[in-house]
């Protein structure tokens, strides 16, 4: 049983055994839910659930199929906050430019990315980070997820985004380390 939340409303779902979660290093982190319902069920974008300590949100409309008069089959693909990193561009924190060169150590590059993520939402923090020399990365209309990939490639390392929900506080930690 999965409980979806949307504002003050909750929806209890009895999911099929085919439902699954998928997480890849430097890749997607999704929760796919399959379920049936005797009537149409409105599951609005923004609905969320907690699953094994992570918060998954519905970022796109649900997919449903009508099988007769009283049977709807639903597929919901919920994503972690990592999906939001594909929406927002990196800006220079000094003058707001979106095209700029930046020479810094790994932790400073990571701080730039986390600062940009916190401009749009809250709860993003820096986690473990490698030590390294200063290197130049050119940001040119770069979204945050691509900036993380570029940073990992520059230092030949991996990034990881972990999420925790403790007593209602949602924290998203960005690590730059060997995963």
Where are these regions (language model features)?
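Assembly/oligomerization scaffold segments
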Residues: 1-99, 149-158, 179
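Charged- and aromatic-enriched interaction segments used to assemble
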Residues: 79-179
């Amino acid at each position: 049983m999965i409980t979806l939340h949307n504002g003050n409303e909750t929806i209890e779902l009895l999911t099929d055994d085919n439902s699954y979660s998928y997480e890849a290093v430097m890749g997607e982190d999704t929760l796919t839910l399959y379920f049936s319902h005797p009537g149409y069920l409105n599951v609005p974008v923004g609905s969320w659930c907690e699953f094994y300590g992570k918060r998954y949100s519905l970022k796109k409309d649900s997919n449903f199929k009508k099988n007769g008069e009283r049977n709807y089959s639903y597929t919901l693909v919920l994503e972690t906050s990592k999906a939001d990193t594909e929406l927002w561009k990196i800006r220079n924190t000094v003058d707001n430019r979106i095209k700029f060169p930046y020479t810094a150590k790994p932790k400073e590059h990571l701080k730039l990315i986390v600062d940009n993520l916190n401009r749009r939402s809250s709860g993003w923090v820096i986690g473990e980070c490698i030590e390294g020399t200063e290197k130049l990365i050119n940001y040119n209309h770069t979204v945050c997820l691509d900036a993380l990939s570029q940073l990992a490639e520059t230092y030949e390392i991996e990034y990881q985004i972990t999420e925790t929900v403790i007593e209602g506080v949602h924290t998203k930690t960005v690590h730059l380390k060997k995963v």
